[in-house]
Design a protein with these regions (language model features):
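Short, surface-exposed amphipathic charged segments that create phosphate/polyanion-binding patches used
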Residues: 62-65, 113-119, 160-166, 187-188, ...
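Phosphate/pyrophosphate-binding betaalpha-module
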Residues: 122, 126-185
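Hydrophobic alpha-helical scaffolding
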Residues: 56, 122, 126, 194-201, ...
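Conserved structured core elements
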Residues: 106, 126-130, 151-152, 198, ...
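Internal helical hairpin/lid segments
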Residues: 206-296
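Metallocofactor- and cofactor-centric catalytic cores in central/energy metabolism, strongly enriched
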Residues: 1-116, 130, 140-142, 148, ...
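A conserved active-site cap/scaffold subdomain adjacent to cofactor or substrate pockets
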Residues: 148, 165-230
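Short amphipathic alpha-helical segments
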Residues: 34-35, 90, 133-135, 185, ...
């Protein structure tokens, strides 16, 4: 197999026009920034981050709903990344309620078994985390347990991006983690070059090379540069469990309008575990902070350093937008490495 430097050299030979590809995975962005991979790429080849951070795309209205639950004297449980994401009324960290960080939904269920209080798990994530939540629901947790489903599905967001065309994309690098569960069959509907890529620098470079070759050939398909972990069908059992418990629904993404079929909600037979129904919670649209450009970063039409708040008013200790909170957020990643083109060598 060719080394990273050899693949980069081939890219320099083949890239004879402007290419812009989008990845939809915060782990890809972290790997690219950490290794300085962009410094190996031709000037005319750009790789931009899209809505690949599940915490970042959770809209303020859903954060406000979680805050409402904390005000209702519920024990609110969630992943650590979500604690500092600002809603319109503050964050879970500053709410003053009983908010607990857990490693997963099973830990939230354990808490529910040991208390008489209502326990709500704020359930965020793409198709990677939803099957585990679904499997937990199937175990029939105690009656004082429920989830606030903030799950999202990737393909409908890609469809929206392609239809809008504002990012002027030549292709997509598909999220490796998501595709281990879903496979890539659903992505074959899109008439654009795509590749599933892993997370090592060589994986990402190989994915870019495959995308460039598709564009030069004037064709489109889904190539798999990550066959050691991803198959076309994905994890059939995990998908079956997920759709046994959840059904798709229309939801808003932060930085996006309501995208049809892009969310997951509990089916009617499991609604006793649906915190929205249990506590009459309504997700409201909240206008964004006027100076924050997280919305543009998530749509691939701006980069973190374009924001006048970046690493000044907005930094991990005092985040203005969610992209500076999550370890998968582009702004936090760029803040950590503080460069557009790192001079760090490729491993």
């Amino acid at each position: 197999m060719a080394t990273g430097n050899e693949i980069a050299a081939t890219l320099h030979e083949l890239v004879d026009r402007d290419f812009t590809f989008m990845h939809i995975c915060g782990t890809h962005e972290a790997a690219i920034a950490r290794t300085g991979l962009r410094s190996l790429l031709p000037e005319r080849l750009k790789i931009v981050m899209g809505p690949g951070c599940p915490v970042c795309i959770t809209p303020q209205g859903e954060i406000d709903a979680a805050l409402d639950l904390a005000d209702k004297d519920c024990i609110v449980t969630t992943y650590g990344d979500l604690l500092r994401v600002p809603g319109s009324k503050g964050s879970l960290e500053s709410s003053g309620g009983d908010v607990r960080v857990v490693q997963g939904v099973h830990k939230a269920v354990e808490i529910a078994r040991k208390t008489g209080k209502e326990v709500v798990f704020i359930s965020v994530g793409f198709e990677t985390t939803a099957p585990t939540v679904a499997a937990t629901i199937l175990t029939k947790p105690p009656e004082n347990f429920s989830i606030l489903s903030c799950h999202r599905i990737v393909p409908p967001a890609m469809k929206w991006l392609l239809e809008q065309g504002e990012a002027k994309l030549d292709g997509f690098m598909l999220p490796g983690h998501v595709c281990t569960v879903t496979g890539y069959e659903d992505y074959e509907q899109f008439p654009v070059p795509q590749v599933v890529a892993g997370f090592e620098p060589d994986d990402i470079l190989l994915g870019l090379l495959m995308l460039v070759r598709q564009v030069r050939e004037g064709t489109h398909r889904v190539d798999n540069a990550y066959p050691r972990a991803v198959t076309r069908e994905g994890n059939v059992k995990a998908k079956k469990v997920m759709y046994e418990v959840f059904e798709s629904c229309d939801v808003e993404w932060r930085g996006f309008p309501v995208i049809p079929g892009s969310g997951l909600r509990l089916k009617k037979e499991f609604e006793q575990y649906d915190a929205q129904k249990k506590f009459s919670i309504v997700f409201r649209h909240i206008s964004k902070h006027s100076a924050c450009i997280c919305d543009r970063v998530l749509r691939g039409i701006a980069q973190p350093s374009d924001c006048r708040l970046f690493s000044k008013i907005c930094h991990p200790r005092t985040p203005v937008g969610p992209c500076m909170v999550s370890h998968e957020g582009a702004c936090k990643i760029w803040h950590m490495y503080q460069t557009k083109k790192s001079d760090m060598p490729l491993p």
